[in-house]
């Protein structure tokens, strides 16, 4: 039996040439950082360094920082990434050179109409959307929207009381995932779901499908390894977002818009209505009005960017409060003083709670919403002696930045006092980036913080939080791309009544 097949010389030449071309494609960009004198892990042909993500992106970033220092290079497939943890360079990337060089985020592949979402749009289109949407997230608009958000806070408390009455420990992600979903769907689409008690609601089902991303998903992997396939996928109407969910929400926004126009509900204050108002304003320039497709894209991206991040962040806060009774008690005292006799929370009272702000900020330092901030270099540029070629993705690794002992005393410790009035002025704004910084920071930052704080106030007004036998101490972080605990955070709630 022959081990080597008996092929013609032409076939062998063709096979050898194909393998050589494949190897060249898989390695052509992998010498970039070595040429520039920038350290980093050794890439594997075709795949780059993505296999190093096995223990999680955050762990890879942390290990690289400890090994290579504040600047290193790595590769996702053929795409070069330059990681930076120098505050001066971070400031240049996020702020000073934002409009001229680092305007755009990384493209993740074929996105269909989701390219019209503010987080994924580019250059002039992004500027236009930011200009239109920024007034929607002002303090004044959020204050108007606060009664609607508080309504979902009341639903959260009803659900918590029912769960607490069972006497069983509670899965934090389940309860706060439902709360987060209700707040976002209510404020984005104007629907009341009560997703904890209606998990089969089509709205909830379609929304959760949007959030299912696996780091080694074959389709995503094909986009990472062969970026040239993206326009082909676009032509074939493929998308990284599930088509059924996209069509569902696109149709839903159109229906909701028609219903509101028919019933003349112009006074409702939610994101959908505020976006509709850009179309209805007299004298509104056509380029400043959102199309129906753009409205759908923004509403969907609110779910994509807000649901998991908010619910996971609240769960982390609850874990820290449960395992630090002194911090919990101090925060309860502040809440009780501001809202005696369990008075309903007001927007102004929430915004004035200093210790609550300190606790939330410290939790976001230890457990950042995003593991990285990415910007693509639009041209060759040199910053502080570091040459960055056109097309390089400049990434800021948030986890190691937030735990860097050079900037944070005892960085692994949960210490809200870091963010006290006396101390927070000494924090460099470019080493604490839970929502990014500069013109392209998270537009929904205020909304997310209000959402988190509203939940924390409601819980601590009515319950004491305690660890139980099922609580994982110390907490371990998942290997998934989204920063989250390895297992569910399970805690016990005890009524204060």
From Swiss-Prot:
GO CC terms of this entry: endoplasmic reticulum membrane
Similarity comment: Belongs to the cytochrome P450 family.
Entry-linked Gene3D superfamilies: Cytochrome P450
Topology with respect to the bilayer: Peripheral membrane protein
Lineage summary: Eukaryota, Metazoa, Chordata, Craniata, Vertebrata
Its biological purpose: Catalyzes 16-beta- and 6-alpha-hydroxylations of testosterone.
Localization annotation: Endoplasmic reticulum membrane; Microsome membrane
Pfam families to which the protein is assigned, alphabetical: p450
Record EC number: 1.14.14.1
Species per Swiss-Prot/TrEMBL record: Rattus norvegicus
InterPro entries associated with the record: Cyt_P450, Cyt_P450_CS, Cyt_P450_E_CYP3A, Cyt_P450_E_grp-II, Cyt_P450_sf, Cytochrome_P450_3A
UniProtKB keywords: Endoplasmic reticulum, Heme, Iron, Membrane, Metal-binding, Microsome, Monooxygenase, Oxidoreductase
SUPFAM superfamilies: Cytochrome P450
PANTHER family assigned to the protein according to its UniProt record, in alphabetical order: CYTOCHROME P450 3A-RELATED (PTHR24302:SF8), CYTOCHROME P450 FAMILY 3 (PTHR24302)
Protein name, entry field: Cytochrome P450 3A18
Known cofactor(s): heme
Single GO MF annotation: testosterone 6-beta-hydroxylase activity
Any GO BP annotation: oxidative demethylation
């Amino acid at each position: 039996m022959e081990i080597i097949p008996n092929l013609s010389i032409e076939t062998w030449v063709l096979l050898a040439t194909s393998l050589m071309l494949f190897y060249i494609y898989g390695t052509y960009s992998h010498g970039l950082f070595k040429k520039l004198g920038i350290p980093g892990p050794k890439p594997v042909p075709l795949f780059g360094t993505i296999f190093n993500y096995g223990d999680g992106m955050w762990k890879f970033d942390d290990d690289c920082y400890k090994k290579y220092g504040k600047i290193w290079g790595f590769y996702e497939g053929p795409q070069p990434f330059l990681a930076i943890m120098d505050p001066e360079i971070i400031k240049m990337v996020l702020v000073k050179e934002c409009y001229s060089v680092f305007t755009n985020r990384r493209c993740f592949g074929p996105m269909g109409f989701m390219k019209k979402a503010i987080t994924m749009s580019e250059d002039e289109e992004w500027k236009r959307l930011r200009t239109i949407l920024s007034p929607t997230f002002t303090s004044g608009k959020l204050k108007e929207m606060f009664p609607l958000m508080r309504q979902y806070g009341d639903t959260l408390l009803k659900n918590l009381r029912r769960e607490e009455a069972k006497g069983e420990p509670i899965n934090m992600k389940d309860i706060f995932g439902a709360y987060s979903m209700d707040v976002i769907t209510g404020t984005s689409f104007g629907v009341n779901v009560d997703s904890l008690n209606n998990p089969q609601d089509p709205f909830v089902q379609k929304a959760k499908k949007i959030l299912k991303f696996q780091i080694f998903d074959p389709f995503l992997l094909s986009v990472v390894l062969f970026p040239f396939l993206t326009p082909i996928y676009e032509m074939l109407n493929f998308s990284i977002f599930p088509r059924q969910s996209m069509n569902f929400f696109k149709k839903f926004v159109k229906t909701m818009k028609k219903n509101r126009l028919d019933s003349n509900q112009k006074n409702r204050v939610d994101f959908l209505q505020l976006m509709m108002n850009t179309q209805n304003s007299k004298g509104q320039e056509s380029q400043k009005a959102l199309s129906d497709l753009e409205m759908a894209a923004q509403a969907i991206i609110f779910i994509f960017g807000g649901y998991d991040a908010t619910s996971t962040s609240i769960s982390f806060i609850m874990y820290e409060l449960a395992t630090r009774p002194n911090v919990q008690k101090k925060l309860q005292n502040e809440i009780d003083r501001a809202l005696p006799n369990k008075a309903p929370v007001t927007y102004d009272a929430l915004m004035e709670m200093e210790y609550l702000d300190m606790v939330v900020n410290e939790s976001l330092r230890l457990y950042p919403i995003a593991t990285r901030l990415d910007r693509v270099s639009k041209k060759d540029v040199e910053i502080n002696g570091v040459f960055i070629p056109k097309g390089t993705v400049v990434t800021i690794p948030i986890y190691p930045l937030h735990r860097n002992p050079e900037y944070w005393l005892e960085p692994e410790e949960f210490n809200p006092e870091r963010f006290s009035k006396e101390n927070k002025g000494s924090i460099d704004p470019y080493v604490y980036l839970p929502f990014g910084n500069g013109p392209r920071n998270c537009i929904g930052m205020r909304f997310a913080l209000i959402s988190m704080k509203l939940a924390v106030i409601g819980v601590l007004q009515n319950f004491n939080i305690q660890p139980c036998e099922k609580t994982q101490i110390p907490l371990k972080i998942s290997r998934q791309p989204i920063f989250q605990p390895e297992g569910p955070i399970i805690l016990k709630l005890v009524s204060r009544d």
